[in-house]
Amino acid sequence: MFLMETKLNKNKGRGILERCSFLDGWEVPKEGFSGGLFLGWMPNLKVNIQHGSKNLIYVELADTSGNPLSISFIYGHPNLAKREEVWVELKSVRSISHRNWLCIGDFNQLLSHEDKFGFKNSRIEGAEAFRQTLFKLELCELEATGQKYTWMNEYEDDSFIMERLDRAFASVEWINSHPHYAFRNQPILRSDHGSIVSDFELRQPSRKRPFKLQRLSRSTQV
């Protein structure tokens, strides 16, 4: 389980472990009045934390077949001017990750106008830099069922906005190793974000569906 914006002080994540029955966890405390990350896992997983910061937790573990697996849990910076720093950090992590690599979290970044619903036309800033990062890292977007948008603001007038900020990307090697993966975007209920529920090892899919590979090219337009 990966939580963002926990706003917890150091060592306060222990309470989350107890409430959710996790064996172990790792946290990044808040800075000032915002931020904070928490990652918890079940007893059957041996997770090795390799890198942690206020925007990214990188871990290594073995999948159910015993193959090495890398996962990066992302919290994109809310400030557009500082978001590039997160992409640079992600690139540095790629240099030490296994080819079997998954990236998941709140990237705080749209890729196109299709990721946004609102009553006012607005420019999608930062999309090109994000696309180029995904292209250089050779990451493919993973299909998710459920809700199209994963975040909404609190306005009830024509300033109301819904966006798709939470998503998952993976290397081709990860996709080939987990052909029956499932991601589902949950409804937005008690927070301004909806959670992503994932299952990497579905053994008996209800139907065989082809994977829609969405490699992001340099020529993609916003």
Predicted regions and their residues:
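A shared catalytic/ligand-binding motif for oxyanion handling
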Residues: M1-V222
